[in-house]
């Protein structure tokens, strides 16, 4: 679709400007520019080749900022807190066992930090089809990393996540003793032997994890720490992103023909709505019943099947044509 629109823009420009004498004479100038807007902040090198065409190359990057996410650690995959007669949840009981065995205290909440990772090289061609040579159409592309955002747990929650991984390892060892014949070698158990009553309680409780959302079949997705005891996610789009837009270029000061401003508006075609993956490869955007904050962020990102570009730039012409 973007290729067809590009062809239409160029054809219209050529047909409109072909009658103007000297329109296509090659007589370039060079300018440098700074810009800011929805693509971040950046710089450009510009060359007005003739009355009709201008070429721009540059780099934009999004300044650092953070947005929070919070998850509750649960035990088991049925969504039931499992309160006992004393009002303690399943998590409270298992966290107590873990503290008794290891001395580590586990918090039920894990905070994650989301931050942009959006930077792109750009190559753009402006076409000035009108007589006043201020309004223009633009085609070109942006290119950068496919990962445009990352999320990871706060450093303060590393101990909690280490405890979650430790508990799940204990669960696996207990499970092996009860149900996995391969855990026995020459009559010796390779798992972890605890008092039978403790084994029963751990197995009845289930594994620890953070409920992020549900798969389409209704199964709950429980995110667990990776091998480094961290939880992470990445937001991805296409690395190559065609661009179509329009803009206006004018003088800042009529007495100084070297200093210009420009407004650009258009769309970056980045391959549909961004996709979000956790460290274990699960695509969050395909889940339903997402956690509150995650649901809000995913709903927002799903609306952006293309990325809107709205930028302001100021340029200085190094030498005139």
Indicate residue ranges for each PLM-predicted region.
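Transmembrane beta-strands of outer-membrane beta-barrel pores
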Residues: 36-40, 59-65, 141-147, 250, ...
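Transmembrane beta-barrel domains of outer membrane proteins
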Residues: 35, 44-46, 126-128, 247-249, ...
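Short loop/turn motifs that connect adjacent beta-strands in outer-membrane beta-barrel proteins
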Residues: 21-29, 52, 130-135, 251-261, ...
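Outer-membrane beta-barrel "beta-signal"
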Residues: 305-321
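Transmembrane beta-strands of outer-membrane beta-barrel proteins
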Residues: 28-34, 43, 51, 55-57, ...
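Extracellular/periplasm-exposed beta-strand and loop segments of Gram-negative cell-envelope proteins
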Residues: 29-35, 64-119, 146-239, 271-305, ...
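Ordered, amphipathic secondary-structure segments that act as subunit-interaction surfaces
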Residues: 115-147
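Cleavable N-terminal export/targeting peptides
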Residues: 1-26, 319-321
């Amino acid at each position: 679709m973007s290729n067809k629109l590009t062809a239409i823009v160029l054809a219209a420009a050529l047909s409109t400007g072909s009658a103007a004498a000297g329109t296509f004479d090659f007589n370039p100038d060079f300018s440098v520019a700074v810009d800011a807007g929805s693509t971040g902040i950046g710089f450009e090198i510009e060359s007005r080749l003739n009355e009709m065409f201008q070429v721009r190359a540059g780099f934009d990057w999004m300044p650092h900022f953070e947005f929070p996410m919070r998850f509750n650690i649960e035990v088991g995959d049925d969504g039931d807190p499992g309160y006992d007669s004393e009002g303690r949840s399943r998590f409270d009981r298992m966290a107590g066992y873990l503290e008794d065995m290891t001395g580590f205290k586990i918090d039920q909440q894990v905070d994650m930090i989301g931050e942009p990772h959006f930077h792109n090289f750009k190559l753009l061609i402006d076409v000035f089809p009108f007589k006043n040579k201020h309004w223009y159409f633009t085609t070109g592309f942006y290119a950068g990393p496919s990962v445009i955002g990352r999320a990871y747990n706060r450093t303060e929650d590393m101990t909690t996540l280490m405890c979650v991984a430790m508990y799940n390892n204990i669960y696996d060892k207990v499970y092996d003793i009860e149900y996995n014949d391969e855990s026995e070698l020459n009559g010796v158990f390779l798992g972890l032997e605890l008092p039978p009553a403790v084994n029963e309680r751990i197995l009845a409780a289930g594994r620890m994890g953070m409920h992020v959302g549900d798969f389409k079949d209704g199964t709950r997705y429980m995110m667990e720490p990776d091998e480094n005891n961290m939880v992470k996610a990445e937001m991805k789009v296409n690395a190559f992103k065609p661009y179509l837009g329009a803009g206006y270029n004018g003088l800042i000061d009529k007495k100084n023909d070297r200093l210009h401003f420009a407004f650009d508006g258009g769309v970056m075609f980045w391959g549909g709505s961004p996709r979000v993956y956790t460290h274990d490869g699960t695509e969050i955007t395909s889940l339903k019943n997402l956690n509150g904050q995650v649901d809000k962020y995913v709903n927002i990102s799903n609306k952006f099947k293309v990325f809107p570009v709205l930028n302001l730039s100021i340029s200085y012409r190094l030498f005139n044509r």
